[in-house]
Amino acid sequence: MLAASQITFLQVDLGRWDRSPGGDAIVVPLWTDVRPLRGAAGLLDWRLNGRLSQLLREGRLEGAAGEKLLFFTTRVPWRRVLTIGVGEISTFSEDAFRASMNTVLDSFHGLGIKSVGMALPGRDMERITPERALRVLLSVAEQQAEQNPGNALSELTVIDTPPAIKAMTETVRAIERSLGH
């Protein structure tokens, strides 16, 4: 499992992103039925001069569940961008969240991606609580690390709003206490 020292939090704010150490990849979720893009995806799109919106308009990207696109960038502190399609808002559930986390972590296999900034799917539209999202993510990451030890993340920066970050920080502390750390 990722230790508390390996998890940091970052607000959805370009100024804070620019001052962050960045890493190997930033992950943002895309919905099929939310336009314009919101949250971290919308902010990233703005920083990328509308590249995500253009891909959506051209039909090269839809936001369908399980869809993913990985590309390089120099416009944010992360070297790569991974978009993950999460489908329609109305069909999003904890199972969909879990599936999207598996898709994200599977995508890193063999690419040497160890340090990730991630806007958790469903958080931008309040479809999953911050606490539950973090717990499910950590569970999926632990399962993936057991299956592919060489592919485990070494650093995770969760990107969200200040209230969600506060809730997730408390969740990390509670997990650490329960593990006796």
State each model region's role.
Residues 1-181:
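Glycine-/small-residue-enriched capping loops at alpha/beta junctions
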